[in-house]
């Protein structure tokens, strides 16, 4: 189909500026509100830079990417997914770079607000821990409710991954692990393996087709987040985080500021 000359999807850098500008604006808005309305230090959100937090970040990057890679492999091996090109002929494009930048910004933006700002503000008001988890995950899920091709099961899984991110934040007292997981979960999903990301169009290294009869596993047009495999790996992420945090020697979610 012919694209209009000002269609931003035809110009990846314009698309990045349009989408990324709003995301960066959201980051600064959250930080400014936290600093000047909540009157707290920025690092108190869980953004302190130190070697331990960077290890958390790397673990999050690994866990998010590995989870989505295993979903891809399982669907491929069971015949629920097929490639339009060879696995050894990935299609690198400018989208590989622009969406990496975008998903890095999205990871920071959503974790700073949905985990950092919401949970820490509620904690400062002496809400119970379970309420911190539930409200953060619920608001996170509802935020995605207007996405294209949204499904009830997709929103449930987004709520579940919100709980996982909350647990990562709780277990490490840092945003760095959920930020890392969030970045690679999205990027590997859409820009490596070519799945829709929460219902939005992918620009992957691979073009794929999924079996229409296997929507319960693949998530259909919403992407893997709308399928049972994502549910399994989100739950597995809780156990992986628990094992990691025990080795890390972290305590419970308590403010140091």
Language-model region placement:
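Membrane-embedded alpha-helical segments of multi-pass membrane proteins
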Residues: 20-28, 93-100, 113, 156-160, ...
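Functionally important transmembrane alpha-helices
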Residues: 154-215
